[in-house]
Amino acid sequence: MAERADLVFHNKVIDGAAMKRLISRLIDHFGMAYTSHILDQVKTLGFQQATATSISLGIDDLLTIPSKGWLVQDAEQQSLILEKHHHYGNVHAVEKLRQSIEIWYATSEYLRQEMNPNFRMTDPSNPVHLMSFSGARGNASQVHQLVGMRGLMSDPQGQMIDLPIQSNLREGLSLTEYIISCYGARKGVVDTAVRTSDAGYLTRRLVEVVQHIIVRRTDCGTIRSISVSPRNGVPERIFIQTLIGRVLADDIYIGPRCIAARNQDIGIGLVNRFISFRAQPIHIRTPFTCRSTSWICQLCYGRSPTHGDLVELGEAVGIIAGQSIGEPGTQLTLRTFHTGGVFTGGTAEHVRAPFNGKIKFNEDLVHPTRTRHGHPAFLCSIDLYVTIESQDIIHNVNIPPKSLILVQNDQYVESEQVIAEIRAGAATLNFKEKVRKHIYSESEGEMHWSTDVYHAPEYTYGNVHLLPKTSHLWILAVGTCRYSIVSFSLHKDQDQINAHSLSLEERYISDLSVTKDLARHQLFSSDSSSKKRGGTFDYARPDGSISNGHWNLQYPFILHENSDFLAKRRRNKFIIPLQYDQERDKELIPHFGVSIEIPINGILRRNSILAYFDDPRYRRNSSGITKYGAVEVDSILKKEDLIEYRGTKELSPKYQTKVDRFFFIPEEVHVLPGSSLIMVRNNSIIGVDTPLTLNIRSRVGGLVRVERKKKSIELKIFSGDIHFPGETDKISRHSGILIPPGTGKMTSKESKKLKNWIYVQRITPTKKKYFVSVRPVVTYEIADGINLATFFPKDLLQEGDNIQLRVVNYILYGNGKPIRGISHTSIQLVRTCLVLNWHQEEKSSIEDSHASFVEIKTNDLTCNFIRIELGKSPLLYTGKRNSVVSSGLINHNGLDYLNSNPFYSKAKIPSLTKQKGTGGTLLNGNKECQSLKILLSSNYSRIGPFNGLKYNTVTKQSIKADPVTPIRNCLGLLGTVVLKIANFYSSCHLITYNKTLLKKYFLIENLSQTFQGIIFFLIDENRGIYNLDPCSKTVFNPFDLNWRFFHHDYCDETSTLITLGQIFCENVCLFKYGSQKKSGQVIIVHVDYLVIRSAKPYLATPGATVHGHYGETLHEGDTLVTFIYEKSRSGDITQGLPKVEQVLEVRSIDSISTNLEKRVKAWNERISRILGNPWGFLISTELTIAQSRISLVNKIQKVYRSQGVQIHNRHLEIIVRQVTSKVLVSEDGMSNVFLPGELIGLLRAERAGRALDEAISYRAILLGITRASLNTQSFISEASFQETARVLAKAALRGRIDWLKGLKENVVLGGIIPVGTGFKKLVHHSRQHKNIHLEIKNKNLFEGKMRDILFHHREFLSSCIPNNFQ
């Protein structure tokens, strides 16, 4: 060694990496023993210097960064702008969350970067600054939380909390910040113990799987290998780590020169030569390529990680591998509490301007683009030099490629302004996961959307829809009666209602009738009559089912056969009575009745079905097939014409036959799960009450047909005779024909005449043999349908009225289609339908009719009706926008409203009779009736229809003097059908029920108010009708912040931009004097003002899931939409350790992109189908296992590397090899060797397949470490792991033998473990061992013959069929 005076003094700080290099060089030069003495001296020196320095830490040493104040203020300003955009509907909730996280993360990271320069400038010897580079708990992230800001926190599920902690631990936390800090940090002894025990349990399971893996041979002789190439995008560091310590499987050539030979171990020098020469792909030996799964050889394992030479014989490499994977998990568990749950995801890094100045860069090197948030930016494809010039300073910044420039050239920038965004590294961006986020409604209202939506495939009949493109979802403001079910009020559509006058009360209606107390309830009284007039009415939604404890009906309206028709009111309308007996509950709903079908919106198209009748004569309780013979059928109802019900659709097509007869061939059908054990054979003949499965017996006797499908088994029993035809029998040539009576039947040599129809079907169990099944047939004659016309009076159909009713019979099932009956239900074969039609007048364009259900109630008598009204709805409509429509005061020829119209109270009528109200005439398209709408200052109300009204003009001055809002020159307003059946002056009033909500209702106490139940329609300039919500049950309070009025004066040019029903966002400029302060929908367009209905927009992206129907009323907190988005996984080890466990246990996780189980199934199916047996099973299993092994290793390594933990691949490969070493015997090919569902080793399955004549069907399976621990060769090892009693009982029943080859079973029994020094005993040669060797040689001779047979397939396989070593 050189003299001390000759040594060079290196004044350099030695960190962890430098210390590693020093120790490595010392070992190379001086060896292990001398190096240990040197390291002892280094340790002593370190402790002496630390004692002499005596660094202490005080609270005054925590210096806050000066730039923190304006950084936090800038982030808050950005968050405020983001919140405004979200409120305007420009940014959806997920984007808002993501941008908010990125804003605060960038702020926190910039503070952390500013921390070290600040310390170096102000106090370089600060103890906190010195500790920030010591590692472990003393790192920059810890110090940043002390003097910077804690930033964003992760909750226990790994989700980011979007509210950041702006304070640091030096300043102290507020109450909210403290709660979030506790929520995110999740410190505590209990949690620490749980996490540590999880890592310990993982280690135990890993050791259980591989404890028997020992290095037993020097070379197994394999010629398999795994290819590693530096060219396929693998980072150089990972490439070096993969190669060092391995053994080459093939020679490496560069040109004609061999630079490395087979079975040579790879050192760092050889790896550097590979990298410098860029050699061809390198084939190495790994534990995957070793021939046996119960041990491993020296060359397949490679170098020992302890001393750098080839691993010694007898080394327990399995236990080393298990602990190498599990122990970092124990360490990393504690890292959670070092950083306190702070989010450290990968987001973009910002570049800020150092001072005020003008920025310059080469515009030719950038091209315009947008950021991921949609903001304009420039993208640079190569390195870009940006210059910032001030008066006396010039600053140059180098922007790396693929970064975004957020400012323009020659733009003036301020100090600390963000000028560029450097994209995050690929490693952090790749580590993502898919997350679902539910968005909830912030207010009560009706849901609308502005684009077409699709039904989600898994929710075809539900209310879940998918958005095909970006659009807005709107919640239109509405005040609903949450508990109201049936409203016993006087209000009609567009009547005004005062919501405060409603007292809500819950009651239970015991049956479908109204209670007598309600019938006697007097809702109002009129002064014009001495008799009290009682009545209630409401509007129906005939779209659901009634439930009253006794009945559940899909079609709630039943027509009795003894019903009497009342009367026909007008030409284009007729009324059908619905009567029922209130006393007899059991006879309330007849068993067979006529059902009325009316859509949700109440609109019946031409030739639509009004009612139908299910004849019990055409009802069957068994499955079967319908046949029409040779008669053609016409499908008269397409799919789009079917009647829809809420949540369900009647999808069975209806067929109208042209004959009077059809046939039903009965059969017994059982649909069983795919795993069911069937006790009968296909094409066998059984008797009645024969057991089919363990718990199912046949109801009839006959021929059994078994059809296996993907996930189920269909078992059919054909009753009838079996006929074995002769060569000349003509019947046997046909398959599936109907034979009429009177035809000869060949049963024997004699011919018998048939008395009934029969169905002949040809059965071919094999190619040569066949027989004929003769099955009985049930014949149905289609009689004329029930004459529904008898329910109506004669004058209805004989008066030459527009309306026509037609009776049509439908067969509900197609010709030859199988009919499957659900248990305990009957099958209806024929349905008799009443089809609605009407005469088409020359000038009329009536294409639909409106139907509704009404109930007239007088005294204690109640009558139900169906009202059908033809023609366009007399909706409220006016002409052009700028035309002047007569507007004036009401003077109905001195009519006293107070006495004649009971709809208005005394408080409201004087304002009309004193001629102070204002109204506008609103004409419908046909000008057959007029409707007058009046807006008062206190509420809304509507009068009409009236004929012959006279109007006087008024001036604007009188309007200003009176607090009545005018509707002069109204373009249109939201209105509904004018109910012609309502007689304002009669003693009875109408009521219909909301049939889906019969459990509760509310009662009106203050009867002097008028009320409004809104059912909306929109009319545009082209007279198009938009049905916004045909079945809503909503209540408006016009002055409860749901309506907004503003007066403005805009010119005619800009007025064309505003259309009725238009929905716009907040801050949109509607006219020249300013922007709209609140989002909403235009419901009235007037020359002087608009009426806006408040609305809340929600932006939704393509693929989002919308919950609910269009127009459905949502309450606050209801789920509105669900987003699916990708987010960066936070760099918290609590996300890593459970994921390692899930991968090793082979559980499917959403965040793993490729599901290995699906990949296994796909490989099995494709290759088995291409190659056939036995090669299909062999090759598909080999390729599947090889691919799955590599994928599993990569996924586990990805988790550990993301945490900075380096584990050699060979440890993972030993574990994964055991997880994938078993195959599952399938049920496709029944063999006499293995049972279906049995787990056997892959090598054993290949060996048995070669030795036997028949192929063994098996498929690859990924066990997981727990199942692999319970499926080993040693039952003692399994029993000591878990489920001891079950494992020992099964082993005793099977007579299993434990050969005590592993470590654990020898430890349990107190024997010498076969590793280390105990390994020599196993390799000691004796006579017995020689005999065994001879037997193995004989066996190998036999296998050599098999390999000669399979020789020509070697080129197809990546490796040849291996010999078996025991």
UniProtKB/Swiss-Prot annotation:
<keyword id="KW-0240">DNA-directed RNA polymerase</keyword>
<dbReference type="Pfam" id="PF04998">
    <property type="entry name" value="RNA_pol_Rpb1_5"/>
</dbReference>
<keyword id="KW-0808">Transferase</keyword>
<dbReference type="GO" id="GO:0003677">
    <property type="term" value="F:DNA binding"/>
</dbReference>
<feature type="binding site">
    <location>
        <position position="297"/>
    </location>
    <ligand>
        <name>Zn(2+)</name>
    </ligand>
</feature>
<feature type="binding site">
    <location>
        <position position="220"/>
    </location>
    <ligand>
        <name>Zn(2+)</name>
    </ligand>
</feature>
<feature type="binding site">
    <location>
        <position position="300"/>
    </location>
    <ligand>
        <name>Zn(2+)</name>
    </ligand>
</feature>
<keyword id="KW-0548">Nucleotidyltransferase</keyword>
<keyword id="KW-0862">Zinc</keyword>
<dbReference type="InterPro" id="IPR038120">
    <property type="entry name" value="Rpb1_funnel_sf"/>
</dbReference>
<dbReference type="InterPro" id="IPR042102">
    <property type="entry name" value="RNA_pol_Rpb1_3_sf"/>
</dbReference>
<dbReference type="Pfam" id="PF05000">
    <property type="entry name" value="RNA_pol_Rpb1_4"/>
</dbReference>
<feature type="binding site">
    <location>
        <position position="290"/>
    </location>
    <ligand>
        <name>Zn(2+)</name>
    </ligand>
</feature>
<keyword id="KW-0150">Chloroplast</keyword>
<dbReference type="GO" id="GO:0009507">
    <property type="term" value="C:chloroplast"/>
</dbReference>
<dbReference type="InterPro" id="IPR007083">
    <property type="entry name" value="RNA_pol_Rpb1_4"/>
</dbReference>
<comment type="similarity">
    <text>Belongs to the RNA polymerase beta' chain family. RpoC2 subfamily.</text>
</comment>
<protein>
    <recommendedName>
        <fullName>DNA-directed RNA polymerase subunit beta''</fullName>
        <ecNumber>2.7.7.6</ecNumber>
    </recommendedName>
</protein>
<comment type="subunit">
    <text>In plastids the minimal PEP RNA polymerase catalytic core is composed of four subunits: alpha, beta, beta', and beta''. When a (nuclear-encoded) sigma factor is associated with the core the holoenzyme is formed, which can initiate transcription.</text>
</comment>
<dbReference type="InterPro" id="IPR012756">
    <property type="entry name" value="DNA-dir_RpoC2_beta_pp"/>
</dbReference>
<keyword id="KW-0934">Plastid</keyword>
<keyword id="KW-0479">Metal-binding</keyword>
<dbReference type="GO" id="GO:0006351">
    <property type="term" value="P:DNA-templated transcription"/>
</dbReference>
<dbReference type="GO" id="GO:0005739">
    <property type="term" value="C:mitochondrion"/>
</dbReference>
<dbReference type="GO" id="GO:0008270">
    <property type="term" value="F:zinc ion binding"/>
</dbReference>
<dbReference type="GO" id="GO:0003899">
    <property type="term" value="F:DNA-directed RNA polymerase activity"/>
</dbReference>
<dbReference type="GO" id="GO:0000428">
    <property type="term" value="C:DNA-directed RNA polymerase complex"/>
</dbReference>
<dbReference type="InterPro" id="IPR050254">
    <property type="entry name" value="RNA_pol_beta''_euk"/>
</dbReference>
<comment type="function">
    <text>DNA-dependent RNA polymerase catalyzes the transcription of DNA into RNA using the four ribonucleoside triphosphates as substrates.</text>
</comment>
<dbReference type="InterPro" id="IPR007081">
    <property type="entry name" value="RNA_pol_Rpb1_5"/>
</dbReference>
<keyword id="KW-0804">Transcription</keyword>
